[in-house]
Regions:
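Catalytic domains of cell-wall/extracellular-matrix polysaccharide-remodeling enzymes
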Residues: 141-233
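Hydrophobic helical h-region of N-terminal Sec-dependent signal peptides
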Residues: 6-14
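Acidic (Asp/Glu)-rich catalytic clusters
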Residues: 31-33, 58-64, 80-93, 110-123, ...
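A short alpha/beta connector and helix-capping loop motif
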Residues: 53-76
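Structural preference for beta-strand elements that scaffold enzyme active sites
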Residues: 40-42, 67-71, 91-97, 162-166, ...
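A cross-domain feature marking catalytic cores of carbohydrate-active enzymes
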Residues: 45, 71-74, 96-102, 167-169, ...
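Active-site gating/metal-coordination segments in enzymes
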Residues: 98-162
Length: 237
């Protein structure tokens, strides 16, 4: 059994889920009502809320069946716009794309929390850092938990009923303490979190690997898909 998550920003990632199953136990596919060896496809768009154009493209993709799932960047300027769309088009499979970075040179954002409460997450201009490495260097885990919680609560306040948590640029993987917070809040809010096994997990530091290894199901891989990728570059997993 394989579950394939195909995602785009619109461009994004492909993830494979193939958890091992003990004899006599149902596979994940069977628990979802499918045959044990079924291949299931979820098409997922992240970075919703980052720009009006992304919101429009994502809405059209939801309506046409081009995507079946997505995740929103709550701190970004165009999040309220998508939240309004979401409220008028429920139910949609939309998660929270936990955001701790602002990677563009001339288009920036900060946190949902007051700046004075999360100083370790912000640069000298009051914006999130551009890179995951900077998050790992500067971020105070207490402030990270405060900000992630604020993003979840902000989404709930605007009517989003999230189906999962994932992470912009993988920023919650910057150091083990942040991974633990990510998993903790997923359990607290009863939301599945995006976690990856395969070669990524094997190459991760021991403490990060140990924190993630207990989560189920794990994704076997994460692959970017961009709009200009030629069709011939894709093959069945």
């Amino acid at each position: 059994m394989k579950i394939i998550i195909l995602a785009a920003m619109l461009g994004g990632f492909i993830s494979l889920v193939a958890p091992s199953v003990a004899e006599g136990q149902k596979t994940l596919a069977e628990k979802l009502g499918y045959d044990a060896d079924a291949k299931l496809l979820i098409v997922h768009a992240d970075d919703i809320g980052v720009a009006r154009s992304v919101n429009i493209a994502s809405a059209r993709a939801f309506e046409s069946g081009g995507i079946t799932s997505g995740s929103v960047m709550v701190p970004c300027p165009w999040f309220p716009d998508f939240a309004a769309y979401y409220r008028e088009h429920q139910p949609l499979d939309v998660g929270i794309h936990i955001t701790l970075t602002a990677e563009w040179d001339y288009y920036k954002w900060g946190g949902i929390s007051p700046a004075g409460e999360i100083p370790s997450l912000l640069d000298e201009h009051g914006h999130f850092y551009s890179t995951v490495e900077e998050v790992g260097t500067h971020a105070d885990p207490v402030e990270v938990e405060k900000e992630i919680r604020a993003q979840i609560e902000r989404a709930l306040a605007l009517g989003i009923r999230p189906t999962h948590l994932d992470t912009h640029m993988g920023s919650v993987m910057a150091k083990p303490e942040l991974v633990q917070i990510y998993l903790k809040l997923g359990r607290e809010y009863d939301l599945p979190v995006l976690v990856i096994s395969g070669s990524w997990l094997q190459d991760a530091p021991d403490d990060i690997r140990d924190a993630i290894a207990a989560e189920k199901p794990l994704l076997d891989g994460l692959y970017m898909m961009l709009a200009d990728d030629p069709a011939k570059s894709w093959s069945e997993a």
